[in-house]
């Protein structure tokens, strides 16, 4: 735990941001100068320098040798990221973050980013119907909202001209932004000529960065949904699939049931049946030597359970998860899909959760769920098209967190050198800008401002799972409740006044009926005093 705490303290000195190609930098000027240091509107200076939020700094990349899996050099824009595009970016101070240091780093809030707040990711099966529907509506909003801050590149850096005279960037909706990012980080390398590609390359899978990269990726996704919805209490839920016999979330109330007429499609009763996928035609891109440009390519596909049973006999079990967590070594041997007794390789799904040994022809753990879904989620590059991807990877991240808490590893266990390209400790994560180093995120999720409901102690879990949602709803309608309370008090006061006045008048009439008649006379002072007293009380 000490080492995790130290990592959390050190993290504040590293620069942060939210995603790929900030809009202010995606132009000829940015490409020509190779500088991405946008102005912060709060003080009108690049990176908020006048307010001490950050400054524009040279990018220094690691020159540690990579593994033998990728023998090429200088032909892929992702090599030595982000130097093909930019060599100067914002470096944010303290708890500040964002591409111009105008936001806060993960877990911190407020105008000065001084407030630490821990958000809780919950089991989607434990959420109320209203909460589930809100989550689905947020995803659909993200699918239909152009992201205001980020764009994607539709061409390689070489295609844009030596001085960036032909920039190739495009708008994209917020959901598909993350589909495209997942495609871009895992795509093949173009070697020149139709179909001539290098396939044994992936900057986010099949080695050490798999877990840290996806952790940062989910945090970005979470943050962007908060921004477009204005709901800063939003968290990505998880699906605890241990021991499941089927796709429990594949219902029309959740992530979409099976279409009765075509089992490969989503039920028309689900909003996801209208979704179009992007970045799924890998071979076509390779043959054209072109990047995915986010053009719609057809409906979302899913046919859970109708996969090759020899490749995935079953959904992973509790025993599989516990064995995986018990493995003490994060990375071993060749540090790729052939590594034995590697926690990362077993959890990713290239090794057995019973023996720890690498297996061929089978997919386990993380990979097993992708294959089991038997559709858009089953190919690496386009897998994020299926919203179940979010639920699945949130649970994978929670298993990573359990391993960190169980073994409390020092930072030094993360491979510094000879991992496959993109996976060494000092390598910046592709394609995030400004920059995140892989090894900086081998640390507890508490340092990043979030927790998982099932990892809380029972008391905290009760508060988060049952009490907090109601308190959040009350907070959202407190102004209405206050107004209703004031109106109710006013009505009660008026009613009370009417009742007192009626009673006073009745008593006065009764006294007049009982009093003997001695002719006309002035009212008694006492009677006048009673009237004044009642009036006073009524007024009070």
Curated annotation (Swiss-Prot):
Residues bearing attached sugar chains per UniProt: 87, 233, 293, 340, 374
Reactions catalysed, as given in the entry: 2 L-dopa + O2 = 2 L-dopaquinone + 2 H2O; L-tyrosine + O2 = L-dopaquinone + H2O
Membrane-spanning parts: 481-501
Cofactor: Cu(2+)
Entries under PROSITE patterns matching the protein: TYROSINASE_1, TYROSINASE_2
Binding site for Cu cation B: 366, 370, 393
Subcellular compartments: Melanosome membrane
GO cellular component: melanosome membrane
Pfam families (alphabetical): Tyrosinase (PF00264)
EC primary class: oxidoreductase
InterPro entries listed in its UniProt record: Di-copper_centre_dom_sf (IPR008922), LE_dom (IPR002049), Tyrosinase/Hemocyanin (IPR050316), Tyrosinase_Cu-bd (IPR002227)
Cofactor binding: number and manner: Binds 2 copper ions per subunit.
A GO biological-process term: pigmentation
Primary localization class, coarse: membrane
UniProt KW Disulfide bond keyword: no
Residues spanning the signal sequence: 1-19
Chain sites annotated for binding Cu cation A: 182, 205, 214
Chain intervals with Low complexity compositional bias: 527-540
Protein keywords: Copper, Glycoprotein, Melanin biosynthesis, Membrane, Metal-binding, Monooxygenase, Oxidoreductase, Signal, Transmembrane, Transmembrane helix
Disulphide bonds in the chain: none
Role: This is a copper-containing oxidase that functions in the formation of pigments such as melanins and other polyphenolic compounds.
Similarity comment: Belongs to the tyrosinase family.
Protein's UniProt name: Tyrosinase
